[in-house]
């Protein structure tokens, strides 16, 4: 009798799993009505730093660029045009993932349309995928068209070519990490060793790490223990670490202890958000500046001896936070 009960329970579990898979098919594997499309069907391909001529043109002593956190379809052509007018001097821009709400053709077209007519439409972009660029599933996957739209440098770890990479300028190294693609322990270790080497090899250059998920979560009820375990040691070599995902703004200074004769410089961790989606900031954390409910963007300037970072409100374009690091 017990054996029959066991078989009945197993059958119920299998049937329930089949029903759940059917109900959750779209959430896990994407909308069946939005199939993958060919390269010929993609209406726009962004300029990236995979192009040597683009990179050579920006080998100058002074650089300026814009950085946007999560967007989630919150910004339109008018917003981008205003950013273009306010900062005509920027030479490229960066985005931390979750530009769109879902990784479908419709949203990809919306993303491009939000840039038409602005100088962000014709400048190089440093892009990384966020969790909303990935198709959900038992194992999340990044649609192939993302790499076609953003043909990034192929200088990262073997399993993350085109999504984890670095870009060098005379006085700064920018490092992009695809955190949503980290599925296995070996992924974390491979990227962590690569990151440590990239930061060490940067020499006297300023170093900025850009990633979608934060090492130190800033939203209430959130934490990323695997991210912290994998990367917190390497990050002591970085000057600034930018992240998104938590839908608020928070800047904190992490002062590491000195090791032997080496004096440790602090690392600045910044969580930023350009979308209307908002989460409350964690309590009991010693932030230098923090708030929720106001979408922002960053304007960065790099000179031979100073890195300037300014944060502006996307509501009224007023300055909210700023700091600089000098060599």
Which sequence ranges carry the predicted segments?
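Active-site glycine-centered loops adjacent to acidic/histidine catalytic or metal-binding residues
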Residues: 70, 97-98, 130-131, 177, ...
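Conserved beta-strand->loop/alpha-helix structural units within folded catalytic cores of enzymes
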Residues: 96-99, 199, 210-213, 234
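The substrate-binding groove and active-site-proximal loops of carbohydrate-active enzymes
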Residues: 68-72, 99-105, 178-187, 219-222
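Acidic, histidine-bearing metal-coordination/catalytic regions of metal-dependent phosphoesterases
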Residues: 1-72, 77, 81-91, 117-125, ...
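Structural motif
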Residues: 65-67, 94-96, 174-176, 208-210, ...
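Extended active-site neighborhood of metal-dependent phosphoesterases/phosphodiesterases
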Residues: 37-50, 57, 105-203, 227-230, ...
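Active-site metal-binding motif and surrounding structural segment of the metallo-beta-lactamase
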Residues: 85-103
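Short acidic, glycine-rich surface-loop motifs adjacent to enzyme active sites
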Residues: 202-219
């Amino acid at each position: 009798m017990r054996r029959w009960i066991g078989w009945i329970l197993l059958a119920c579990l299998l049937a329930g799993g089949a029903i759940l898979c059917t109900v959750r098919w779209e959430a896990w594997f994407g909308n069946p009505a939005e199939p993958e499309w060919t390269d010929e069907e993609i209406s726009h391909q962004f300029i990236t730093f995979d192009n040597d001529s683009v990179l050579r043109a920006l080998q100058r002593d002074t650089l300026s660029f814009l950085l946007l956190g999560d967007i989630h379809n919150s910004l339109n052509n008018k917003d981008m045009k205003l950013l273009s007018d306010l900062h005509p001097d920027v030479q490229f821009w960066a985005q931390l993932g979750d530009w769109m709400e879902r990784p479908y053709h419709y949203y990809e077209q919306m993303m491009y349309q939000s840039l038409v007519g602005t100088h962000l439409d014709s400048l190089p972009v440093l892009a990384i995928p966020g969790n909303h660029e990935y198709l959900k599933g038992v194992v999340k996957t990044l649609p192939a068209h993302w790499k076609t739209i953003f043909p990034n440098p192929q200088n990262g770890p073997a399993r993350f070519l085109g999504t984890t990479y670095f870009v060098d300028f005379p006085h700064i190294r920018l490092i992009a990490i695809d955190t949503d693609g980290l599925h296995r322990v070996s992924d974390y270790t491979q990227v962590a060793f690569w990151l440590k080497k990239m930061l060490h090899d940067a020499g006297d250059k300023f170093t900025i790490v850009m990633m979608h998920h934060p090492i130190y979560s800033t939203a209430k009820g959130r934490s990323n223990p695997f991210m912290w375990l994998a990367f917190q040691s390497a990050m002591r070599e970085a000057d600034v670490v930018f992240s998104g995902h938590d839908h608020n703004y928070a800047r904190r200074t992490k002062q590491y202890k000195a090791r032997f004769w080496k004096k440790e410089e602090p690392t600045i961790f910044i969580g930023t958000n350009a979308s209307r989606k908002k989460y409350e900031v964690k309590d009991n954390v010693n932030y230098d500046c923090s708030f929720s409910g106001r979408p922002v963007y960053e304007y960065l300037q790099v000179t031979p001896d100073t890195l300037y970072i300014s944060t502006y409100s996307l509501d009224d374009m007023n300055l909210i936070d700023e700091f600089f690091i000098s060599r």
